[in-house]
Amino acid sequence: MDDSGKTIKGSVDVKGREGSIEVSELMHSIEQPTETLTGKITAKCLHSSFSFMKEIDSSSPWLYKALSTGQTLKSAVFKFYRINNNGQEEEYFRTSLENIKVTEVNSLMMDVKKHQWARHNHVEFIDFSYKKITWHYLDGNVIYSDSWNERNG
């Protein structure tokens, strides 16, 4: 969602997820700075960029706009799906980001003339920085958030 409250739409046409953006890869890490010998915590957790890969789609120009203008996006929700014991797809985990800056966009087009890349679509790697992140494991409603401007005990 952009800073005016408008949803940035992707090209997914799967029933129930129409207009969302399909993410094919995701990487994010958090590091707790500690003293090497004692393990004593020396600073607040360091959050890396929230990085993901997606196909170039209708959301791409909006993400480029946010990057090039310094626009703050209000929120983004990443939903994780799996196949349950009944063979049905279900959402089981969710990561929500708030007050997001698009910090990098890298486009990639593999050499589609080479056989191994012939069926690969054009993709882009997006990096987000954020002020708040919330992790939500749906089974049991387990939720935790971390924010740059709040202390969590």
Q: Could you say what each language-model-derived stretch is?
A:
Residues 1-153:
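Glycine-rich, low-complexity intrinsically disordered segments
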